[in-house]
Amino acid sequence: MASVNIKPLEDKILVQANEAETTTASGLVIPDTAKEKPQEGTVVAVGPGRWDEDGEKRIPLDVQEGDTVIYSKYGGTEIKYQGEEYLILSARDVLAVVGK
C-alpha cells in the first residue's frame, strides 16, 4: 500500500477497494460487466474525526490506516488519483473491520 497525498476531512476515510474476483471456484472467467462491486478494501488514510456537539473536541474514528474494512455497497465517492482508484467513505458507511 503506497502512501497517498490525500488527507480526508472530518469523519471521512480513504479506502482502496480490493480487487473483485476474476474467476469462479470452478475456473470460469467472470467478465467485467458481471463482476459485483467490491465491498471490501484497505484504509489508506483517515480524517481527524468530527467535532462533538459542543464543538470542543474531536470524536476519533474506529478505523486506522492499514485496516481492512467492509463497507456499504453503494456508499462513498469514487475518485482516481495518480492512476489509482480510491473511495472516500463517511465513517457511517463502514460496516465492519476485518480481523487480522
From Swiss-Prot:
InterPro entries: Chaperonin_GroES (IPR020818), Chaperonin_GroES_sf (IPR037124), Chaprnonin_Cpn10_CS (IPR018369), GroES-like_sf (IPR011032). Its main location: cytoplasm. GO terms for molecular function: ATP binding; metal ion binding; protein folding chaperone; protein-folding chaperone binding; unfolded protein binding. PROSITE patterns: CHAPERONINS_CPN10 (PS00681). GO terms for biological process: chaperone cofactor-dependent protein refolding. It is found in: Cytoplasm. Keywords: Chaperone, Cytoplasm. Disulfide bonds: none annotated. SMART domains: Cpn10 (SM00883). GO terms for cellular component: cytoplasm. NCBIfam families: PRK00364.1-6, PRK00364.2-2, PRK00364.2-4, PRK00364.2-5. Together with the chaperonin GroEL, plays an essential role in assisting protein folding. The GroEL-GroES system forms a nano-cage that allows encapsulation of the non-native substrate proteins and provides a physical environment optimized to promote and accelerate protein folding. GroES binds to the apical surface of the GroEL ring, thereby capping the opening of the GroEL channel. Heptamer of 7 subunits arranged in a ring. Interacts with the chaperonin GroEL. Belongs to the GroES chaperonin family. This is Co-chaperonin GroES. The gene is groES.
